[in-house]
């Protein structure tokens, strides 16, 4: 659903940009190719929705590994390392304000995934943790968590100017010993939710996969 909302935002931006463009001279025989109208874009979105519930995101054709730096849209991305802890307390990201802390069970462990993002584009980007998704062998998403132990290191969100890097951690609770069956998915378009150049950034709507084995 979050992808649908983001795409609707793209439609709104596209309409605003079209309204601001100057009209061509009526006497000209050849006119520049016009941008699609909002109605046409909405029809395309509706078509995608009917196909599979929400517009399909492209998937990178490579499976990356821990320690590998690769280009993902307007960023260079690296999963530096993955640590495991088998005790301690945590809370769900996005949980209720009064939600109680949880304790790692005997058959569970918490993954602490350290990642680095580098902005290799010309414009600043606003990164956000919603651009990351941990999936199990059945392609099911795992809810992110946080612990006081990683205070100050959690990759929640911020602004990254051109040429700069940011390093932080993501955390998830999984069954003990099952790390090799999990994949971290990074989508630079979803991570950059506040870009001023949305039409360009939508090209970055690609899932990049990093196996955690």
From Swiss-Prot:
Chief localisation class: membrane
Keyword Cell membrane attributed: yes
GO cellular component, one term: plasma membrane
Subcellular location: Cell membrane
Lipid attachment in record (S-diacylglycerol cysteine): 20
Lipidation (N-palmitoyl cysteine): 20
Gene name linked to the record: yjhA
Skewed-composition ranges (Basic and acidic residues): 26-62
Region called Disordered, residue ranges: 20-62
Keyword entries, A-Z: Cell membrane, Lipoprotein, Membrane, Palmitate, Signal
UniProt entry tagged with the keyword Metal-binding: no
Entries under InterPro entries matching the protein: DUF4352, Immunoprotect_excell_Ig-like
A Pfam family per the record: DUF4352
Protein name, entry field: Uncharacterized lipoprotein YjhA
Signal sequence annotation: 1-19
Recorded topology in the membrane: Lipid-anchor
């Amino acid at each position: 659903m979050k992808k649908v909302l983001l795409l609707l935002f793209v439609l709104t931006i596209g309409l605003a940009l079209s309204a601001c463009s100057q009209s061509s001279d009526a006497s000209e025989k050849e006119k520049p190719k016009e941008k699609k109208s909002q109605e046409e874009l909405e029809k395309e979105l509706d078509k995608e929705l009917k196909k599979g519930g929400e517009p399909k995101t492209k998937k990178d054709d490579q499976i990356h590994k821990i320690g590998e730096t690769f280009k993902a849209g307007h960023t260079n991305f690296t999963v530096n390392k993955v640590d495991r802890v088998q005790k301690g307390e945590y809370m769900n990201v996005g949980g209720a304000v009064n939600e109680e802390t949880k304790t790692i069970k005997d058959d569970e462990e918490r993954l602490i995934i350290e990642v680095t993002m580098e902005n290799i584009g010309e414009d600043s980007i606003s990164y956000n943790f919603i651009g990351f998704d941990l999936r199990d062998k059945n392609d099911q998403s795992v809810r992110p968590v946080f612990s006081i132990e990683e205070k100050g290191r959690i990759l929640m969100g911020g602004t990254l100017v051109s040429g700069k890097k940011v390093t932080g951690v993501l955390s998830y609770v999984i069954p003990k010993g099952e790390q090799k069956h999990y994949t971290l998915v990074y989508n630079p378009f979803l991570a950059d939710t506040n870009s001023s150049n949305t039409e360009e950034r939508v090209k970055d709507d690609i899932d990049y996969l990093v196996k955690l084995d």
